[in-house]
Amino acid sequence: MSLLVIGINHTSATVDLREKVAFSPDKLTKALDELKNSDAIKSGVILSTCNRTEIYCEVKLGISSGYVINWLAEFHHVALDLLMPSIYIYEEQAAVKHLMRVSCGLDSLVLGEPQILGQVKKAFADAREHNAVEGVVEKLFQSDFSVAKRVRTETNIGGNAVSVAYAACTLARQIFESLAESTVMLVGAGETIELVAKHLNDAGCKQLIVANRTRERAMILADQFNADVISLPEIPEHLSKADIIISSTASPLPIIGKGMVESALKQRRHQPMLFVDIAVPRDIESEVADLNDVYLYSVDDLKSIIDHNIEQRKIEAIQAEAIVSEESAGFMTWIRSRQAVNSIRQYRENSESIRIELLQKSIQALASGQNAEKVLAELSNKLTNKLIHAPTLAMQQAAKNGEPDKLAVIRTSIGLDN
């Protein structure tokens, strides 16, 4: 058995090279079929994301990592000398540990990010669909998913916001007890606001207002998250309805001023409002923070929160790494015990084959009228000689080669030193 991982990722390779060896859906189907039909690879899974391409496999006896690397280079028509400097290789327990670290987000560009686990699960499902994975590799991935779940349960590695969009939503959850009962106004409709909307939706927010310069872009978000749409000039009219305002536009001048917020507060009878301004330059006048019942956070405030949370994730990662080390060692113990089970089964089958062969000869001898006592004595002698032949030769060879430790193991194995 030889477990192997070969791959490149965001730390070892440039974007250009990662793009060259990425597997599109069509390429993945062809690649998995090639792995399945390979004479050198027993079982394999291909993980391909924007940040990494990795092949997890069990190779047959005598096959080295070079075979898999050559296959990857040839498949993508990439020169081997271009690929090799960026390749990393993990074998046996190191391969097991690497997969577990990847799935737990410990090897990600953003430490602890949860999306990678879904990508690993998809890679495994694809390999299964094409009958490319079985045996040890299949068991490895199943164990890996349990380890990732344990890490998420026993540590808080994914619990601290490390993106601006998620940090903004985390602030909202901290200040307002229930987002399901809060109205959120999103100013802008770009990628960051779309991420904010997704996080808010996941957190249970049901009342969203999207304010944007162009209605068409705002409608895309509105359809996706069941939101109301207004134009930027309509913000003063609707601002009082919002408990939380998160803004990210490309406007060169502030969109929301102190006077506008004062008016909204009066209409709300001074119920608190949270403003999160993640635009550069600012969408919300800094003087808004001077008002009572207003919480105003800028992108710099969020950055300090994110920096703190990254440090917290690093602390949580220490415990996660300990879990991965423990679980990878446990998986290797399972592999060794599996190998022992196979050896025991083969030993029993060989012994049973000898027994049946000699028994049949004895039955034939008895049927031909030979003396029963003589037949039984011959059976017992031959059975004893055949069963002790292999360990006898092994002890003689160990003694001849000056291998006392090996001789001691054999003696213990056959019960001489128990």
Swiss-Prot record:
Q: Which GO terms describe its biological process?
A: protoporphyrinogen IX biosynthetic process from glutamate
State which pathway it belongs to.
Porphyrin-containing compound metabolism; protoporphyrin-IX biosynthesis; 5-aminolevulinate from L-glutamyl-tRNA(Glu): step 1/2
Q: One Pfam match, by short name? A: GlutR_N
GO MF annotations in UniProt: glutamyl-tRNA reductase activity; NADP binding
What InterPro entries has UniProt attached to this entry?
4pyrrol_synth_GluRdtase, 4pyrrol_synth_GluRdtase_dimer, 4pyrrol_synth_GluRdtase_N, GluRdtase_CS, GluRdtase_dimer_dom_sf, GluRdtase_N_sf, NAD(P)-bd_dom_sf, Shikm_DH/Glu-tRNA_Rdtase
The record ties this protein, via CDD domains, to: NAD_bind_Glutamyl_tRNA_reduct
| Reactions catalysed, as given in the entry | (S)-4-amino-5-oxopentanoate + tRNA(Glu) + NADP(+) = L-glutamyl-tRNA(Glu) + NADPH + H(+)
* Domain-level remarks: Possesses an unusual extended V-shaped dimeric structure with each monomer consisting of three distinct domains arranged along a curved 'spinal' alpha-helix. The N-terminal catalytic domain specifically recognizes the glutamate moiety of the substrate. The second domain is the NADPH-binding domain, and the third C-terminal domain is responsible for dimerization.
Q: Describe its function.
A: Catalyzes the NADPH-dependent reduction of glutamyl-tRNA(Glu) to glutamate 1-semialdehyde (GSA).
Q: What does the further note read?
A: During catalysis, the active site Cys acts as a nucleophile attacking the alpha-carbonyl group of tRNA-bound glutamate with the formation of a thioester intermediate between enzyme and glutamate, and the concomitant release of tRNA(Glu). The thioester intermediate is finally reduced by direct hydride transfer from NADPH, to form the product GSA.
Q: What is this protein called?
A: Glutamyl-tRNA reductase
> Which organism is the protein's source?
Aliivibrio salmonicida (strain LFI1238) (Vibrio salmonicida (strain LFI1238))
